């Protein structure tokens, strides 16, 4: 991507030598697809000849290009085959700044099973995972597709396998049923299964499916609606509350006070997707005001830059955020206008 240099800055050349032909093949990608994506991402021009990469641009742009190539070469050195997704993630992380190296973020293994590795894919996800390691209670708040629940469950399985905890407890509010499961037909399992199915699906990604029924029968893994947490003290457990935006303030307090010795809690949710009845305030909204600043409690905020689903999902999240902000601004203007007319009417009445 060629740009006009800023006034007073001359374009210069920077060269990077890649001594191993196989590394260069990986760096360029099949049909040069990686190279084309890199060129689109940079303000400097990039040309490759033999084992040499020539970067042409103003010094500041060249420095960005050098950093990008350095990270991509580090990924290759760590045994990775470059993909367009890895390049986009690296470009995004470099644009955000921060002290973390993208190559380190993208190669941080949480769990591996049958050749599939679960890793953070963004800076926000890496910081979220680090917070889970460092704090007893962590809130993961962000839009759909940011890996809030999936990464929390991966950390729970990792902790169980490392014998840091004795059991995993997964819960979510069955708000669609009003948590009045007794009014639904069928056994308890049949009643709660539709609401907890996403948690089972994630478990099947992380554990041998044949072992899951045995672990559940032994109480090592428990999946239950939030209402079933009341009155318990949960020791030596990794506890995850999913869809926490659909808890009331009272339910959130009840859940957090289940914490026992040797346990950790991760609470996940998206405050833009509240399904509670009108007028009911979300416990996930209020808990931040109540617990911010409390020792050993951390709030991790994920955003559209952390979405790891289809690239359109990130754009959709941003579009809805803009729409919500515009609607809120219009509502506020309407309130101010009504207040202004009311005040003027009051003054007119007093003059009469």
Task: Please name every model-derived segment.
Residues 2-3:
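N-terminal intrinsically disordered, cationic/polar leader segments
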Residues 7-26:
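Short glycine-/aliphatic-rich beta-strand segments at the starts of folded cytosolic domains
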Residues 23-40:
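Short amphipathic alpha-helix segments
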Residues 40-42, 49:
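N-terminal assembly/transducer modules of large multi-domain enzymes
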Residues 47-105:
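Interdomain "pre-motor" coupling segment immediately N-terminal to P-loop NTPase/helicase cores
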Residues 52, 114-125, 134-241, 245-352:
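Conserved helicase motor core of SF1/SF2 NTP-dependent helicases
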Residues 105-117:
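Conserved adenine-nucleotide phosphate-binding loops and their immediately adjacent elements
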């Amino acid at each position: 991507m060629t740009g006009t240099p800023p006034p007073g800055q001359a374009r210069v050349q920077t060269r990077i030598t890649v001594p191993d032909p196989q590394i260069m093949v990986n760096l360029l990608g099949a049909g040069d697809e990686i190279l084309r994506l890199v060129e689109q991402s940079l303000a400097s021009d990039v040309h490759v000849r033999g084992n040499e990469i020539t970067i042409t641009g103003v010094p500041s742009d060249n420095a960005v290009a050098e950093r990008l190539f350095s990270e991509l070469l580090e990924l290759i050195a760590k045994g990775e085959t470059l993909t367009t997704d890895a390049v986009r993630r690296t470009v995004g992380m470099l644009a955000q700044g921060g002290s973390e190296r993208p190559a380190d973020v993208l190669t941080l293994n949480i769990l591996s099973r049958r050749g599939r590795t679960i890793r953070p894919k963004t800076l926000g996800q890496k910081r979220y995972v680090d917070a889970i390691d460092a704090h007893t209670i962590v809130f993961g708040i962000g839009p759909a597709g940011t890996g809030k629940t999936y990464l929390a469950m991966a950390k729970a399985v990792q902790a169980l396998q490392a014998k840091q905890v004795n059991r995993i407890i997964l819960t979510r509010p069955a708000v669609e049923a009003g948590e009045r499961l007794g009014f639904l037909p069928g056994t308890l399992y049949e009643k709660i299964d539709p609401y907890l199915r996403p948690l089972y699906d994630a478990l099947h990604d992380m554990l041998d499916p044949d072992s899951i029924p045995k672990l559940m029968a032994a109480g090592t893994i428990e999946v239950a609606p939030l209402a079933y947490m009341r009155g318990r003290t949960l020791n030596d457990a990794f506890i995850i509350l999913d869809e926490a935006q659909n808890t009331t303030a009272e339910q959130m307090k009840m859940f957090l006070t289940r914490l026992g010795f040797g346990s950790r809690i991760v609470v996940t949710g998206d405050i833009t997707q509240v399904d509670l009845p009108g007028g009911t305030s979300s416990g996930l909204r209020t808990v931040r005001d109540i617990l911010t600043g409390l020792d050993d409690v951390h709030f991790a905020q994920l955003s559209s830059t952390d979405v790891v689903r289809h690239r359109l999902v990130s754009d959709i999240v941003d579009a809805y955020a803009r729409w919500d902000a515009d609607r809120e601004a219009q509502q506020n203007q309407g309130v101010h206008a009504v207040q202004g007319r009311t005040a003027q009417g009051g003054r007119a009445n007093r003059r009469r």
